[in-house]
UniProtKB/Swiss-Prot annotation, chains A, B:
The keyword Kinase applies. The gene is PFP-ALPHA. Its main location: cytoplasm. Keywords: Allosteric enzyme, Cytoplasm, Glycolysis, Kinase, Magnesium, Metal-binding, Transferase. This is Pyrophosphate--fructose 6-phosphate 1-phosphotransferase subunit alpha. It holds the Pfam family PFK.
Length: 616, 616
């Protein structure tokens, strides 16, 4: 099997064309001299967790933000790294394949070779298991040739994606030491980057010389916080899904007799569903976050869809397209509670066929109410992160089934007078995950790869490579690095089998912000989407011409560039210092004192633990 | 509802770009003067059915092939049509939406307006039901503006797609008379074109002045015969499906733990599955035609897949991608027989829950053996063409289930030593059907629209618009028209509820020719596909650059241009006549006589009814 990794392969004409595409580097990373500015120490967004995070990360918490600037940038404190001794770096895919992953490795390889041709990049074969077993492939131009700008993770493969147990951490450390690695780059999502931070702390504690760097690559788009604007893979996934969704919309409008229920891969959070809605304008989407916030039951959801179907029928429309995120099922309070009971029993070793009889009365009642196929799926063992096997639970079929039953009832009672309700169900995910990456994902991943090199060259440990201001063209991107521990939060409540992770700092999947601009855009258009069939067909992913440079709608509407604004604030503070120097007038000093007192008062109040709710 | 048809709509950037694309016309159709050559009378490919076809089509059988040539073409007998009195033409979508359908209407509209600005084109709203109810929308440049080169049938919509019963035929005739139509263009597949031929005959018989023209538009690609090389929509469908299949292949190769079972829409025949296999090189495909020819049972198929899984595991490969056409289920002899029994009972009014007890003993045994979900799907009422509801029967889940059971058994017995078998199932169809059409489909459909006009201008009735030599660039395409009745065959055997159609000439779906070049290409590569993972990713549908002008593999490898070769033969015959004129030498005459006697002997033998098996 391993012999197949990284082998050259036959490419289609389009793949060949793409393999010749070369992403642009932002000015700050061009050439071989990069200035590194390390400014203020970072803090966790949720102050209430800070104490715990500090305790878990004594060596790596509170490190400063890093900015990478062009050599000519006029920043007094920045350090120019001019010496580039040869280093050895390892890299691995950790977590589900996301389009663009290969380009991180390509970018890292290019940066390594530009700065010192003697630098060595080793790819671990088969993900974390390859790391533990020290199975490597040296990354060279030849190896990369047929993987540049290509989808999948097949250059190196991936496996179970966990570096968490003592045994796993020790195996990882042994590998880094045996291979004399100066750096270890972990490409993955929320879970893998959490593991990366813990690994970095362990390395710092034990004086292991390998620096650990994380890269935000996940199609779910849920590794989002004040430092991270977007994840590699999300753009492609949403574009491919939107292509398919809008094809289905066109189909619905042509035949006028089907309701399509489409479930979208994306784990617990509904980012993919929201973005696809903004791109393709289906009639409805039900976000897990809405359901959780309004505590909607499965019956509420059914009624809401039935009312929509009925409203459309009154406009003579007997077709429609409804999106459901795969995480929806866990967002429905009573289903979540049922799942927790089931998982608890599974953990106790109760066999699947015995579970029904051991559920609490109310859980048992819900369970027995559900159709046969969905019961079987709810009984599946939970995933390694303690969530249900979301990709295997056909929520779309469950909802379609309940809606159909209700519509037939309404038809019989005469309250619904439209055509007989017909549903067709889909699950979109696997068919998008292996796609050729979009231009944005190619560019973003490639530049992130370069950033990884500069993090290592600066000797930083436990950082994630970050690029901000992404909605602007690549030549305006800001490159930097943030300590992963500063992105962590601590969950204090929980129940069920996941209890073990309570109290341990971790990156948690960012949910859709119901007060954010993307959601606002959806809310404003929801009625129009529902009734007017303003379906939008962005078409298949293009690499040239209109649409090729389009970016995710949610990326473009959100307030962005947190890090740019942090820098702006620092400039203001510097300016105040320059203006209010000893010798300035009484009036100027008075005005400055008054204004600063007011600012500090306001900030103290709104950043006290009691008033903060984590924005992600 | 109707108010929504043909309304201008917001297009995405890519849709806008596409809406400005203008297909090229072959030289023969350029300008306003086209020469029509009507040569030899056509005959049915299967002589044994000829008598019956003649009886059903006394007015429209045996009409000559028509060729459209450029005005300057030196063909002695061709007629130049110079007068173009204003005509009124109706057009409707009939049958499942196929990408490119809109362009037939656009091409027809352009041709009408070029030849006489007073020509009128009426689109029927909502397919055949719009025809019966005489609901029309006049097609204008404004209406077309946002539908050019766009997918779906939403400009006019479509419905049940049948013009067959006396009542339906009479309603159609009434509409044509009331609207004073000179021509009626029916856009559809096998069934709709059969209806078109019968309608043409009826019109001829009753002296209705409306001429009926059919256009081969069906994503299934099964309207294929000596006159028709390809169908509008097939190219797009196969490209979109291949994009998704190859994404799944990349995914399989990255995660290395799943077997993907993908069922493909395409009705009874396996053209879509074959073409997608040739484009994306998955590990396996099981064509319905192979199963039928080898009389494989469902157990044989299971064993065959299990052996493949086992062979791959011996090469350390625990992943794979397997394609199944949706028609497969009907190709399995014992399942087909079971379906016939079920449909018979359903027709007798037996309710679904009672059917199991009334099946014959062997059918009952098979039925009870099948998993619960598939039993429910087999009990669905058959479609209007008497076939099972193929899109609703999850054959891929059935096969995956049976394979999993068998692999677990082998694992237990120790005959299989690979990893635990994991299957993920997909059905690809709806998400491809509404796609933006490929350049080929845009061009092909647009030119077919023009051909329709010339058929009507030449006063032909009961013809299908045909273009041959399609594998070459559009400027080498040959445009013509063939009587639909000449493409018909007569089924003499059959059982079950479909019996009524036995003995009536019809177009039957062309199955994959197991002696054809496309299948040969598959056979040659099958082992390599199975074991070597030579996955090919053509990428998303492009409209520019590499791949944009690619044509279906099966189109390119098949011997083509039947009509071009018919013309070539006529040239040979003409040449013989020129050479062997009275006055030629004894030797020349002797040689000619001997050669011609031999040729006629050979042709008589191989075209006798007993030796002909229909090639489609």
């Amino acid at each position: 099997m391993d012999a197949d990794y990284g082998i050259p392969r036959e490419l289609s004409d389009l793949q060949k064309l793409r393999s010749h595409y070369h992403p642009e580097l932002p000015p700050c990373l061009q050439g071989t001299t990069v200035r590194v500015e390390l400014r203020d120490a970072t803090t966790a967004a949720d102050p209430s967790g800070e104490h715990t995070i500090k305790r878990f990360f004594p060596h790596t918490y509170g490190q400063p933000l890093a900015h990478f600037l062009r050599a000519t940038a006029k920043v007094p404190d920045a350090q120019i790294i001019t010496e580039h001794p040869a280093i050895r770096v390892g890299v691995l895919f950790c977590g589900r394949q996301s389009p663009g992953g290969h380009n991180v490795i390509w970018g890292l390889h290019d940066a390594l070779k530009v700065h010192n041709p003697k630098n060595i990049l080793l790819g671990f074969l088969g993900g974390s298991e390859g790391l533990f077993a020290q199975k490597t492939l040296e990354i060279t131009d030849d190896v990369l040739a047929t993987y540049k700008n290509q989808g999948g993770y097949d250059m190196l493969g991936r496996t179970k994606d966990q570096i968490r147990t003592t045994e796993q951490v020790n195996a990882a450390m042994a590998a880094c030491k045996a291979l004399k690695l100066d750096g270890l780059v972990i490409i993955g999502g929320v879970t893998s980057n959490t593991d990366a931070a813990h690994l970095a702390e362990k390395f710092a504690e034990t004086k292991c010389l390998t620096k650990v760097v994380g890269v935000p690559v996940t199609l779910n788009g849920d590794l989002k916080n004040q430092f991270v604007e977007a994840n590699v893979g999300f753009d492609t996934i949403c574009k491919v899904n939107s292509q398919l969704i809008s094809n289905v919309c066109t189909d619905a409008l042509s035949a006028e007799k089907y309701y399509y229920f489409i479930r979208l891969m994306g784990r617990k959070a509904s980012h993919v569903a929201l973005e696809c809605t903004l791109q393709s304008h289906p009639n409805m989407v039900i976000l897990g976050e809405e359901v959780a916030a309004s505590k909607l039951t499965i019956f509420d959801i059914t009624q809401q869809i039935c009312d929509a179907v009925q409203a459309r029928a009154e406009h003579d429309k007997n077709h429609g397209v409804i999106l459901l995120p795969e995480g929806l099922i866990e967002s429905i309070p009573e289903v979540y509670a049922l799942l927790q009971e089931i998982h608890g029993l599974l953990r106790q070793g109760v066999s699947a066929d015995k579970i029904s009889s051991q559920l609490s009365p109310w859980a048992s009642a819900l369970f027995e109410f559900l159709p046969h196929f969905i019961r079987k799926q709810l009984l599946l063992h939970p995933e390694s992160d303690d969530s249900a096997q979301l990709s295997q639970i056909e929520t779309e079929k469950l909802i379609a089934h309940l809606v159909e039953t209700e519509m037939n009832k309404r038809l019989k009672e005469g309250t619904y007078k439209g055509k007989k309700f017909n549903a067709i169900c889909h699950f979109f995910g696997y068919q998008a995950r292996g796609s050729l990456p979009s231009k944005f994902d190619c560019d973003y991943a490639y530049v992130l790869g370069h950033v990884c090199y500069h993090i290592l060259a600066a000797g930083l440990n436990g950082y994630m490579a970050t690029i901000t201001n992404l909605k602007n063209p690549a030549n305006k991107w800001h490159c930097g690095a943030s300590p992963i521990s500063a992105m962590m939060t601590v969950k204090r409540y929980g129940r069920g089998p996941g209890k073990a992770s309570i109290g341990v700092p971790a990156l948690h999947p960012a949910t859709v912000d119901l007060r954010g601009k993307s959601y606002e855009l959806l809310s404003q258009n929801a009625t129009k989407f529902l009734l007017d069939d303003v379906y939008r067909n962005p078409g298949p992913l293009q690499f040239d011409g209109p649409g090729a440079d389009a970016k995710a709608v949610s990326l473009c509407v959100e307030d962005q560039d947190y890090i740019g604004r942090i820098k702006k604030l620092q400039e203001y503070l510097d300016k105040v210092r320059t203006i209010v120097k000893p010798g300035c007038s009484q009036d100027v000093l008075k005005a400055a004192l008054s204004a600063m007192a007011s600012v500090t008062d306001i900030l103290s109040v709104i950043s006290s633990p009691s008033s903060v709710s984590t924005p992600f």
